């Protein structure tokens, strides 16, 4: 009988093990999709948690910015994911190789196949905690090993002493089966959400659905999960503010935002929608349904409490504009956006537990956590809808926190616990040297530069100062020597539960634009903002957003046949 391929052609066995490892990763993706049950998910989490703070800053800073220049979003996270996939492939390949060695000693292909699949399944089940979806990993690896074993023996003479031709057939069989598994795994892993068309139609017929956001409603959730998130018109606990504000719908808010937009070419509208930025600690977003979600309030409270999704939505339904900006956003970056949110004030939940401490730690289902003052949380919002649709999975479905006027890192997504603390502690980013729990820095960004048909130049952007609001934006076209006031978009309206007399949204950005006769050649355009307290945006520019967020005046060189800077 011919000797095993491992003895006669070790290179073929190593290649078979590698291909089986790849097939195991793809098989995991086929059953789990891009969820926490995918084999790469726990590995990326472990890499992130153990990554040195300096390396993590480099990944979310220079690496991410370089990726944006190449048109690649979140390059740092993508590299982390690739590393995790590589490690998973190496782990599975090692286990398959061990199975092949064991099978060689026993001189039976069935041991090789069964052991390869079993070891890979066991490893995937232990790492992900999901033995069912781990079957995909085991099946993928076992299939490649099985095809390699059987193709090697096909047509092999019984009295041959050479395994070379059989080894080649084994390699070709491994390669073909790995390609087949990869194609099938890609198709299955990217299968449409299990949210049914009927549920999607139900959400869209509530009268306030933004098609863009509704379409991204939490893939992988159950059929009822997309129904009526933020759209229920029969809520009995809507509070009457006395000014008719509760009569407004999401469509009304969106219409006002469109009307008040300056309509500048190349400038994002006042409502971001699907373009809303996304920054997460983990590569794979949690996949939590409304039915399984709950929020616990624990710690230094008179009585701890748990709230389900139905409990939160029964407390009322408020609409409000809200802008978020990430503390890692560069001075003229794009990690700042605005939308219409549906939810309830956090204070309604806190009054039931009577908190005794002065600080809180907000925790997420993905292991993220951030600490800040209880007083700040009292003015915050629990959002369960966005632009008339359910809160998308990537933005915290089913419920997230929104902390007005503060850096986005404390607006925790996939919120599942509020722990009241007696004293301060460090959150995830503070443990890594950041200080992003306070109010946002005032900024005026310069994102649009247009040469108009009449020969004039138009520059425009967004401006934001948190709850301080924006009083004016000033533009200089001579490098800061002289200043002119820009045109501002109208203030967005207050929320449906705003106090009587409120004239504008508490926490929303504005657009600005300035049109002028350009001088000959290149010239430097500088922009700065004055907030609602009359305070001028600080001029000194930081080298990076770390640790307190970017500051400075945005400047660009314009003219001379193009835009520079």
Roles of regions detected by a PLM:
Residues 12-37:
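N-terminal signal-anchor transmembrane alpha helix
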Residues 182-204:
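Hydrophobic alpha-helical transmembrane segments in integral membrane proteins
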Residues 195, 220, 229, 238-565:
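Structured, non-membrane catalytic/scaffold regions adjacent to prosthetic-group chemistry
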Residues 206, 210-213, 218, 222-243:
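Asparagine/serine/threonine-enriched low-complexity, disordered tracts
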């Amino acid at each position: 009988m011919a000797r095993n391929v491992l003895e006669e052609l070790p290179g073929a066995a190593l290649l078979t093990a590698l291909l089986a490892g790849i097939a195991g990763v793809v098989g995991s993706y086929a059953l789990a999709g891009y969820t926490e049950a995918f084999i790469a998910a726990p590995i990326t989490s472990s890499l992130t948690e153990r990554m040195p703070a300096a390396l993590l800053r480099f990944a979310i800073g220079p690496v991410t910015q370089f990726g944006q220049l190449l048109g690649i979003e979140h390059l740092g996270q993508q590299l982390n994911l690739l590393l995790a996939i590589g490690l998973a492939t190496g782990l599975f390949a090692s286990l398959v190789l061990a199975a092949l060695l064991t099978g060689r000693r026993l001189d039976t292909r069935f041991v090789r196949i069964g052991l390869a699949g079993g070891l890979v399944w066991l490893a995937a089940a232990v790492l992900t905690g999901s033995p069912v979806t781990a079957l995909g990993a085991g099946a993928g690896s076992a299939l490649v090993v099985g095809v390699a074993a059987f193709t090697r023996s096909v047509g092999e003479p019984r009295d041959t002493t050479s395994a070379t031709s059989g080894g080649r057939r084994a390699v070709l069989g491994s390669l073909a089966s790995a390609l087949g598994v990869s194609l099938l795994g890609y198709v299955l892993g990217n299968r449409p959400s299990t949210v049914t068309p009927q549920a999607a139609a139900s959400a869209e017929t509530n009268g306030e659905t933004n098609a863009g956001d509704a379409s991204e409603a939490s893939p992988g959730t159950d059929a009822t999960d997309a129904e009526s998130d933020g759209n229920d018109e029969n809520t009995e606990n809507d509070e009457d503010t006395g000014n008719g504000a509760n009569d407004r719908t999401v469509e009304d808010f969106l219409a006002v935002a469109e009307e008040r937009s300056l309509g500048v070419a190349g400038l994002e509208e006042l409502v971001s929608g699907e373009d809303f930025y996304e920054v997460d600690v983990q590569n794979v977003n949690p996949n939590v349904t409304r039915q399984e979600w709950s929020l616990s309030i624990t710690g230094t409270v008179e009585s701890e409490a748990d709230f389900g999704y139905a409990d939160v939505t029964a407390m009322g339904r408020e609409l409000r504009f809200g802008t978020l900006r990430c503390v890692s956003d560069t001075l003229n970056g794009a990690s700042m956006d605005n939308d219409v949110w549906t939810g309830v004030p956090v204070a309604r939940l806190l009054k039931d537990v009577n908190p005794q401490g002065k600080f809180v730690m907000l925790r997420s289902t993905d292991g993220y956590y951030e600490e800040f003052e209880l007083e700040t949380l009292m003015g915050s919002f629990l959002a369960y809808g966005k632009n008339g649709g359910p809160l998308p999975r990537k933005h915290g479905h089913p419920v997230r926190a929104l902390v007005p006027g503060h850096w986005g890192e404390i607006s925790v997504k996939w919120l599942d616990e509020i722990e009241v603390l007696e004293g301060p502690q460090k959150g995830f980013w503070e443990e890594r040297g950041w200080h992003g729990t306070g109010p946002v820095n005032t900024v005026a960004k310069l994102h649009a530069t247009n040469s108009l048909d009449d020969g004039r130049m138009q520059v425009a952007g967004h401006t934001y100062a948190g709850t301080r609001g924006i009083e004016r934006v000033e533009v200089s076209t001579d490098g800061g020597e002289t200043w002119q006031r820009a045109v501002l978009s109208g203030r967005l309206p207050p929320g449906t539960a705003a106090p009587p007399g409120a004239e504008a949204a508490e926490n929303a950005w504005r657009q600005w634009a300035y049109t002028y006769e350009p001088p000959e050649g290149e010239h430097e355009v500088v922009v700065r903002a004055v907030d609602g307290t009359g305070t001028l945006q600080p001029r000194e520019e930081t080298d990076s957003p770390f640790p307190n967020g970017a500051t400075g005046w945005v400047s660009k060189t314009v003219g001379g046949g193009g835009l520079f800077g």
